[in-house]
Amino acid sequence: MKKILFTTVVLLVAASAAAQDWKDALKKIATTAVDEVTDGKLTRYALDGTWNYTGPGVKFEGGDIASEVGGAALETAVVKQLEKAYAKAGIRPGAGTFTFGKDDDAFTATLGSHTLSGTYEYDAPTHVVTLHFAKGKLNLGSVPGHAYISGQELVLVFPVTRLVEVVTALGSKVSYFSTATTLLSKYKNVYVGFAFSK
């Protein structure tokens, strides 16, 4: 009797988890499809609000990575290296937010103990978001990147070299990026940055 009860509980928990995974997957597929149909405008409207940092973000554009069997393994290795570099700068899951203003195109980012602000521009068809940082203690100027929303997840990514500049300015050591940049140096159109959720 106990074995039957235990098996039933395990099956119910597994079914519940699988249903949640399917629900999340369908939500991501739906938002991606609508975003493509609206030529990126869904992402523009969905950017507004506060996003909570969940971990490093990596985005490969183009076909060179997608066609490789090792693409997922490469992404995992890069994420692990980025986690180390971000931790050195005080950027950890739960210790960061990014807020995009609804009406004024302003943004505020809190990453670790650093708060950055400025304005942003978003080009819907290309998903290019350019952050214009306000002058302050860290003079970062304008940083172009890409923003992608899938379900309740935002991936905000930048060219590898620009991200190294930003995180270095926040206090991380460039040596922590050496493994990630070495892995990515042979690929074109590789963007790294941050993942957020609402």
Where would I find each of the regions flagged by the language model?
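Bacterial Sec-dependent N-terminal signal peptides
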Residues: 1-25
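Lipid interaction determinants
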Residues: 20-103, 108, 116, 124, ...
